[in-house]
């Protein structure tokens, strides 16, 4: 059994997310938000616009995946060429990248919510680890110098796909002030 599992519902950061993040930081120049240029904001934008790629799509109907790729390339190419004066995405390149991802992650993909639910039923201990802290939360942090996903403990259950009442203990680490990577304040 692998020591790491990847949810079949996991969204994937694509190389063009990193490119878009980099292009946007350059466009904003001195007024940027200090991105780490790892593609996180464009990734979340795609996730919530329902145009991101889910791991399960890699193992589904290839024609549907190619249709999704065509839709994404059409949308992204408007932004890439019109706003950033950057090269267009090629459908074949996006498809090939996704197939590389598929090959890399195939042994690790499963229904992680079911896996965790079974662990709960067996009385096993589950450790959920969050990131950053409340001052970087998009709803409760120092906006706009926040991250793109919720950093609060309550979202641990949501992200893991387990009922919130199964979280029995929360341990937090708090700092006296907020700090960040990139050009964050």
Describe each model-derived feature in a short phrase:
Residues 1-185:
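Non-transmembrane, aqueous-exposed alpha-helical and coiled segments at domain scale
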């Amino acid at each position: 059994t692998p020591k790491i599992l990847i949810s079949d519902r996991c969204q994937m950061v694509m190389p063009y997310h990193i490119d878009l993040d980099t292009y946007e930081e350059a466009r904003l120049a001195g007024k940027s938000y200090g991105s780490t240029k790892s593609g996180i904001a464009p990734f979340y934008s795609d996730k919530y616009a329902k145009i991101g790629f889910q791991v399960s799509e890699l193992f589904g109907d290839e024609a549907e995946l190619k249709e999704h790729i065509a839709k994404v390339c059409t949308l992204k190419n408007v932004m890439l060429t019109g706003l950033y004066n950057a090269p267009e995405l090629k459908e074949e390149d996006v498809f090939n990248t996704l197939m590389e991802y598929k090959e890399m992650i195939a042994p690790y993909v499963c229904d992680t919510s079911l896996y965790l639910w079974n662990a709960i039923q067996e009385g096993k201990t589950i450790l959920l680890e969050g990131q950053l802290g409340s001052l970087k939360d998009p709803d409760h942090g120092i906006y706009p110098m926040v991250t793109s996903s919720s950093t609060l403990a309550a979202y641990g259950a949501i992200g893991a796909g387990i009922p919130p009442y199964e979280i029995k203990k929360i341990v937090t680490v708090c700092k006296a002030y907020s700090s960040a990577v990139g050009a964050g304040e």
